[in-house]
């Protein structure tokens, strides 16, 4: 089984993950824009038991999403890098920030969610997997 590693900007927090993500996307919601300081967040979701924080401590911030649901955001206490997401709607799964992996050339075939909130200057290739808002329950059946 593939193992991948990553960490925060200052190196205090390190993680290891087993396997491939079950879900991956670029989220263009306003909260992800503000959280990352960028146009979107790259989110890779794994079963929570496949993710191990190997060093460092995380601080948690709970926020409301554009959908109205809550999400726990875990970040480095020292440098503030966002590393892990825990959306209430995805029980048993955790999201890892794509930019925090040591190697990123394996990340591909992203779809886009919350496209209705994307910046006007950002072009997104039309794809039926892209969502104007977030996922619906039908996407998980």
Residue ranges and their predicted role:
Residues 1-141:
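A short Gly-Trp-Pro
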């Amino acid at each position: 089984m593939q193992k991948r590693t990553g960490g925060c900007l200052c190196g205090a927090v390190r993680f290891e993950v087993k396997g491939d993500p079950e879900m991956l996307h670029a989220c263009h919601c306003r909260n992800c824009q503000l959280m990352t300081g960028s146009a979107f967040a790259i989110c890779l979701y794994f079963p929570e038991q496949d993710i191990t924080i190997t060093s460092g401590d995380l601080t948690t911030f709970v926020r409301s999403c554009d959908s109205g649901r809550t999400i726990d955001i875990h970040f480095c206490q020292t440098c503030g890098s966002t590393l892990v997401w825990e959306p209430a709607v995805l029980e048993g799964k955790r999201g890892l920030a794509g930019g925090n992996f040591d190697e990123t050339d394996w990340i591909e075939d992203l779809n886009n969610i919350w496209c209705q909130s994307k910046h006007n200057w950002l072009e997104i290739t039309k794809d039926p997997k892209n969502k104007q808002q977030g996922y619906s329950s039908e996407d998980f059946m």
